[in-house]
Amino acid sequence: MFEDPRERPRTLHELCESLNTTLQNLQVQCVYCKETLQWADVYNFAICDLRVVYRDRSPYAACKRCVIFYSKITEYRRYTCSVYGATLEALTKKSLCNLLIRCHRCQMPLGPEEKQRIVDEKRRFHEIAGQWKGLCTNCWRPRRQTETQV
């Protein structure tokens, strides 16, 4: 479909422009399970700003179920370390606002409010596969109470 690797669309929006279609009408398969993505999966992939991959010159994306599943596998296999926000800023010499940090569960890029929430809650950012990760608002779970009241 796309012969020249340099001219291949990298996002779903670019792919839609190349194919002269809309996200709603886009037919693309999941690179992992090979199922055709439902419209909700297409929108989720686009909102997460993930990149299209190519196999045999054909574009593939990933359904939400596979993104979550393979994110967990990557976390188990490629976890490096966890650091607090101030330490991360010192390590990278960049403000948290200027760092691309994705949710380690759904791969959504974190906004400034989500990054600040992680700092305020004294949670850590994680280095997984050479990228910094945290938790987005949708995947956030409150900490369990470890003490019981009598």
Curated annotation (Swiss-Prot):
Record's keyword annotation contains Metal-binding: yes
Alphabetized HAMAP family for the sequence: HPV_E6
Tagged with keyword NADP: no
Chain location of the short sequence motif PDZ-binding domain per the record: 148-150
Organism (species): Human papillomavirus type 26
Record-given protein name: Protein E6
Chain's role: Plays a major role in the induction and maintenance of cellular transformation. Acts mainly as an oncoprotein by stimulating the destruction of many host cell key regulatory proteins. E6 associates with host UBE3A/E6-AP ubiquitin-protein ligase, and inactivates tumor suppressors TP53 and TP73 by targeting them to the 26S proteasome for degradation. In turn, DNA damage and chromosomal instabilities increase and lead to cell proliferation and cancer development.
Miscellaneous: Belongs to the high risk human alphapapillomavirus family. The cancer-causing human papillomavirus E6 protein has a unique carboxy terminal PDZ domain containing substrate.
Organism domain of life: Viruses
